[in-house]
Swiss-Prot record:
Keyword Transferase tagged: yes
S-S bridge residues: none
Pathways involved: Isoprenoid biosynthesis; isopentenyl diphosphate biosynthesis via DXP pathway; isopentenyl diphosphate from 1-deoxy-D-xylulose 5-phosphate: step 2/6
Keyword check for tRNA-binding: no
PANTHER family: 2-C-METHYL-D-ERYTHRITOL 4-PHOSPHATE CYTIDYLYLTRANSFERASE, CHLOROPLASTIC (PTHR32125:SF4)
One GO molecular-function entry: 2-C-methyl-D-erythritol 4-phosphate cytidylyltransferase activity
Origin superkingdom: Bacteria
Underlying gene: ispD
Gene3D superfamilies: Spore Coat Polysaccharide Biosynthesis Protein SpsA, Chain A
Keywords: Isoprene biosynthesis, Nucleotidyltransferase, Transferase
Coiled coil: none
Top-level class of the enzyme under EC nomenclature: transferase
The species this protein was found in: Mycobacterium marinum (strain ATCC BAA-535 / M)
Lineage: Bacteria, Bacillati, Actinomycetota, Actinomycetes, Mycobacteriales
Protein name as annotated: 2-C-methyl-D-erythritol 4-phosphate cytidylyltransferase
Amino acid sequence: MAGGTQGVAAIVPAAGSGQRLAAGVPKAFYQLEGQTLVERAVRGLLESGVVDTVVVAVPPDRTDEAKLILGREATIVAGGADRTESVSRALSALSAGVSPEFVLVHDAARALTPPALVVRLVDMLRAGHAAVVPVLPLTDTIKAVDANGVVLGTPERAGLRAVQTPQGFSTELLLRAYRHAGVAAFTDDASLVEHVGGQVHVVAGDPLAFKITNRLDLLLAHAVVRG
């Protein structure tokens, strides 16, 4: 990216198949009470008032459909074979314009994330933190288990958090993390940043930012939207 920095961009990797959801379409294109999950995710970002640009990575055979659905609300790119490649392609698409100061990465499956959470995240970035993720405290007891199903121990729950999205980063730090990603498997972008020595801070998450992964999640999402 070149040409100075400006504003906040958001990337929405939405190229997954959604096999666990078993909805018959890629998960991001599932219709939740009249709007696809990706529409809801993008509009939640924009309604925050702190996101200037959105880039969405979708399955290559769904780019035309995504452009029709999202119109001028987002730039559409063909996603890659996995989440990391999809985000990398979206980062490349951002290089066509003025480099944003910050980049948020948000799961389309967290379609009901409140705009207020996005605002809290960006406020933390603007306060000087280069990497910020929303989290919730755990309510279940967690067990460490080996490959044979034997419990190895019980981590202290007070120091553990469940991580949500959007996750926010300075553009420079996120680009550096992706340049050094290699072939290792990372489940979120904060993990890549940790891999290159970045310090990640947390901000209060929101129960509505839950990830829609299975049929039970869908039932909850429909109930929330219906009120």
